[in-house]
Amino acid sequence: VHLTGEEKSAVAALWSKVNVDEVGGEALGRLLVVYPWTQRFFESFGALSSPDAVMGNPKVKAHGKKVLGAFSDGLAHLDNLKGTFAQLSELHCDKLHVDPENFRLLGNVLVCVLARNFGKEFTPRVQAAFQKVVAGVATALAHKYH
């Protein structure tokens, strides 16, 4: 991902304030609610029958935290996202057979959650930088599919 120095600083500054536990659970939960077909990859998580069930599901929250932990690793290696996410790309492609479009959807949901959580601090300029990052992460995660 090509970010200017200013964009990298904006992303790092905002991300340093993110509560990975909460934001991860909310982002994954929203993905499962807004795009219900993504739930098929999480059948072992139990109750996903309603938005409240999804958003309150401890397994969704735990996996969301794990997802954002990996995203945090990516932020530390913006110049090598493909390498950073190579193993996760292989896992999601070869073993889990996740539709790579889901990575893009999750990135966009994450941007929505950040906007909701940070309000005016999540300026259009910050959003533009994050959109580049989530697009780069989605591309890196989809790499094994090509």
UniProtKB/Swiss-Prot annotation:
Where do the Globin domain residues begin and end? Answer: 2-146
Query: Where, by tissue, is this protein expressed?
Result: Red blood cells.
InterPro entries for the chain = Globin (IPR000971), Globin-like_sf (IPR009050), Globin/Proto (IPR012292), Hemoglobin_b (IPR002337), Hemoglobin_oxygen_transport (IPR050056)
One annotated Gene Ontology cellular component of this protein:
hemoglobin complex
The molecular function terms in GO held by this entry are: haptoglobin binding; heme binding; hemoglobin alpha binding; metal ion binding; organic acid binding; oxygen binding; oxygen carrier activity; peroxidase activity
Kindly state a single biological-process term from the GO annotations of this entry: hydrogen peroxide catabolic process
Question: Does the keyword field hold Heme?
Answer: yes
What S-S linkages are listed for this chain? Answer: none
Binding sites annotated in the UniProt record for heme b: 63, 92
Query: Positions modified as Phosphoserine?
Result: 50
Q: What UniProt keywords are attached to this protein's entry?
A: Heme, Iron, Metal-binding, Oxygen transport, Phosphoprotein, Transport
Would the keyword Transport turn up in this protein's UniProt record? yes
Provide the family line: Belongs to the globin family.
Q: How does it assemble?
A: Heterotetramer of two delta chains and two alpha chains.
* Name of the protein: Hemoglobin subunit delta
Organism equals Leontocebus nigricollis (Black-mantled tamarin)
Q: Which gene encodes it?
A: HBD
